[in-house]
Swiss-Prot record:
Organism listed in the record: Mycoplasma pneumoniae (strain ATCC 29342 / M129 / Subtype 1) (Mycoplasmoides pneumoniae)
Domain notes: Contains two DNA recognition domains, each specifying recognition of one of the two defined components of the target sequence.
Protein name: Putative type I specificity subunit S.MpnORF507P
Quaternary data: The methyltransferase is composed of M and S polypeptides.
Family statement: Belongs to the type-I restriction system S methylase family.
Function: The specificity (S) subunit of a type I methyltransferase (MTase); this subunit dictates DNA sequence specificity. The single R subunit has multiple frameshifts and is probably not expressed.
Length: 363
């Protein structure tokens, strides 16, 4: 089997996106995606009413999370932090190119400075091996199947998130009380305790063992994103944590002993209130920072926030409905997360071995 080696500049037209701001997207809203240097949400920055590219392309991120490669097929625009390749060689499959290039780009990312970069001049000189077009198409089709399955699983996850949001909005709204009386309470009036995390302890370790077994919690968007583990704990009761810095307003239910740090707010309600209900009520609360710059949610500010609360029986009923809906998508150990991770690892495994096989075919 003949293997041909080409530099990107020899088989592609190399372009770059243009300056498209969030303000521009807001003022020119439409149906055509704008791809950026982002790596989440398929790299989408937003949608506008015009497009700069139409057809099959390969894009890569030039700044920040530089070197992440995407296959594009459709009408779209790209920001100035997004490089765009248009294949001009009829013996090259664009999707195969995307898979091949994604294995190579990490080697060429320039990491000096605060933002990693991968510019057009560097990409132009990257060399890739290409088998006959028919083989390229078969490999691309095979690897694409893993991406398609992952996309289906992620769509199911989004569906579950929207389902929870719908029922949460409906059940927590006093307008849908169906005769049930809701009363407005300040958080300070329903709290048994409200505590704030201090500095990260000097005596801790990253890994959990029999001695260092209590998680150190701080401000994070992930429930299980721990700073490390401590020999001691401060909170032993069931509680609700609320991020007060950075990821302000990230709310999690905690049913284990832990040590809070870095101004994390810990809320323990009085026993006459259902903690599971209050968890969902606080998740629905829009917390705001105080002060300029990064700012923070202060203890005094937190205490003054208000929530509508029905009878204890109604609280229990609402919690019984919302709990399973929430934990279906929030639990990282749930099957769909494991399935997504498995498909990702499978694709990486076959991708690496298929392209190693191609390299081994070179004479």
């Amino acid at each position: 089997m003949q293997i041909r080696t080409y530099k990107i500049k020899d088989i592609c037209d190399i372009q770059r996106g243009r300056g498209i701001t969030k303000e521009y997207i807001k003022n020119n809203s439409g149906k055509y995606p704008v791809y950026s240097a982002a790596t989440t949400n398929n790299g989408e920055l937003g949608f506008i009413n015009t497009y700069d590219f139409a057809g099959e392309y390969v894009t890569w991120t030039t700044n920040g999370y530089a070197g992440v490669v995407f296959y594009r097929n459709g009408k779209f625009s790209a920001s100035q932090d997004c490089g765009v390749l248009k294949v001009r060689n009829k013996e090259i499959n664009a999707q195969f190119l995307a898979f091949a290039l994604s294995l190579k780009t990490p080697q060429f990312v320039h990491n000096l400075g605060s933002r990693p970069k991968l510019n057009r001049k560097v990409v132009a000189e990257i060399s890739l091996d290409f088998p006959p077009l028919e083989v390229q198409e078969k490999i691309a089709h095979f690897l694409k199947s893993f991406n398609e399955l992952s996309s289906q699983l992620k769509a199911e996850l989004i569906k579950r998130q929207k389902q929870y949001a719908f029922y949460s909005d409906y059940l927590l709204n006093p307008k849908h009380s169906q005769g049930e009386e809701y009363k407005l309470f300040k958080l300070k009036d329903i709290a048994k305790k409200i505590l704030v995390g201090g500095e990260k302890p000097s005596d801790f370790q990253k890994e959990k063992d029999q001695v260092y077994k209590y998680p150190i919690l701080s401000n994070s968007r992930k429930a299980d994103d721990f700073l490390g583990y401590s020999k001691t704990f401060r909170i032993a009761e069931k509680s609700i944590t609320v991020s007060a810095r950075g990821t302000i307003g990230a709310v999690f239910y905690r049913d284990f002993s832990y040590l809070p740090a870095v101004s994390l707010i810990c809320f323990i309600p009085k026993p006459e209130f259902n903690i599971n209900f209050l968890f969902h009520a606080l998740k629905a609360t829009k917390f705001h920072k105080q002060g300029s710059g990064t700012g923070q949610l202060t203890m005094a500010q937190f205490k003054e926030y208000q929530v509508y609360i029905p009878s204890l029986k109604k609280q229990q009923e609402i919690a019984a409905t919302l709990d399973p809906l929430y934990y279906i998508f929030a639990n990282s150990n749930w099957g769909i997360y494991k399935e997504i991770e498995l498909r990702k690892k499978q694709m990486q495994y076959y991708q690496e071995r298929l392209f190693q096989w191609i390299e081994n075919q070179k004479v």
